[in-house]
């Protein structure tokens, strides 16, 4: 087990005792006046970040100073501290540490400059007795070692009485000025470093000063020329500022490995052409969620020994959560057990709104397999397809993983009998920010529930409604819990429609504020109607302004804008909308997809995102993927290969066809991101800590540069260059569950496309007739008629479809019918195996249902091929 932060401070203090007379004494010469500053935001003019604390009350800014309340009775100075990570030090260089400090009523404060990871070597320290009046402290010293990621800690514990400690004008001058940053962009021919599907689009981008067409060659691993042609000049690309040309080698369709493109004297990174390119990515992108689990020990035999760790936040010291968590002061008078769920991103917080969209996308990736012709009935997402502890339990593994978060979301609901009962607490996280690295089991911070919000409550309502229909075939009791929680949450949100999370509630965790929840109301109403069929929810969604609005933003949907989630489900999940209304809903999806295709064609790097700076935002890679999700959904709805090809081409950007020539997915591509901002995966800072697991998506280029590291390093960057693979850049290089959920969705779609060949024409038509209910609505009788619309005889048939919820076939006639989960398979009897062209076959069944929505299935296949509805 790694030492806790408290233990690290103790180790550093012990080491510094040996250094005090050597490098930390006052006899050192000061660095020159123009020496570079190594501390970010030392005057707190931009707020609290990147400062963190442990063992104190929340950090706050008072009269321009950074202040915290320190509890009395702490045994040691290092039991509480305020600090900053990522301080760069140069061996042999002289530094001057300066700061102003005060404490009331008064206590010793020790400033410690130390190595930020094992063995936590201390470089210098100075102890002063701080009182009510601020005093200025300076100390000059020499550093013996190079260290790009040292740590400055102000130890403020050890007093018998409660203290208020304040710091200001913190400076560490010295060392070498950073060299101008020049990213290593590799060869000027930019390709999808993973590769291309044989029948899919194959495009690359060449960065060049040439303005006329250039010859290109596709070469095998041995150097043989496989194809050739001329580039298409595109001029200066807005997003990158580069003069670029395009290569289209889509006509080459043969599989191969280790291929390269050569143009303008440059050879690309190698790539493959294969119909199985993305099969492993489907699993890798989902494995990320197991690695992010809270409240369970991570099994190294499942994920790899480097990722094994004890359970975090199960009430075992030094953890102070999550089995008995209080609210922030003044918020509530109860405590909740909110164990489990996923750690949200690079921190140890858990947030309902971000957990909501992430859970939705995993559940939707599974639900898509019921209606998408290329999904093969969801076999690739079934039981034992992931390395999770629950594998082999009879439930699809993707549902096992989503359930880990759903159980947490349910625990965040305010209990009955309490004020705001039925609403959901917005989030739970540490009282103060912590530094990096920090394993979950080593987090010493108090944990707090934050006030309930309407947005969080509606996220719970929507995802719990999804849960109620999708888990019903596997765990009826859990599905019933979800349904009850969803209906209760929706009613509570309607009773409290304007409880917004505070945008300033960002100490110790992200604010995730949202003051427009019309989209959340729409999404929740859609999910509840799809699950229950209750007219009240249909009335609410129909009356929502979002129902007829353009909900597909050019820059993509995300946690703060979720109307698109409702629209996509309304378009794809079978339901009882009138035909004209359903056609309008689906047309809105294809219209948005058309716009994304147009944008993709405009962009020289071939992505469905505008090239202006405002479109490159925090987590922007997920926005690009979410636009690809719309394209993919349009393909599922229509079978139009243009939409499939657009979604496939959008993936090229993620895997290296971009200005930086980097794959943003760890472990995928010749040159891939690996130093994402994370307290758990912090190998850059601590060699004993792993890099993020393969399949982890980096946030991506972010023109706003909201972290100090990126702001200093990348100032003036063209939008597509506003990224650095460094753990200190949380604004461009964090991991997050809602980003990986988008990746998991599109990875599953891409894997389903195989070789991306011609879309088969339907050679059958199906009529599904529900003849009505019996036994008080708990049973129904249905009939399925298939017509052979092709030109050849069908000799032996298997028909497959999936129910939306808990429907269960009890008996059938004219076919041999079996059911696994929600999926029904009907096979011919010996006497009706033959269906002549133009001929029909009919079978029927009786089934039970719990009384929710019971629409006809959205997809019926005959021998694996989609049938048209008639």
Label every PLM stretch briefly.
Residues 1-30:
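Secretory targeting and sorting signals
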Residues 30-180, 862:
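Extracellular and organelle-lumenal recognition/adhesion modules and their flexible linkers in secreted
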Residues 84, 125, 263-274:
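Short Trp-Ser/Thr-centered turn/loop motifs at beta-strand boundaries
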Residues 122-130, 225-237, 813-817, 829:
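Solvent-exposed serine/threonine-rich low-complexity stretches and specific carbohydrate-binding patches
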Residues 127-135, 144-146, 233-241, 832-839:
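Short proline/glycine- and polar residue-rich coil/turn motifs
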Residues 178-190, 268-305:
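Low-complexity, Pro/Ser/Thr- and charge-rich linker/hinge segments at domain boundaries
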Residues 194-265, 275, 291-356, 360, ...:
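Aromatic (Trp/Tyr) and acidic
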Residues 756-870:
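Extracellular low-complexity, O-glycosylation-prone Ser/Thr/Pro/Gly-rich "stalks"
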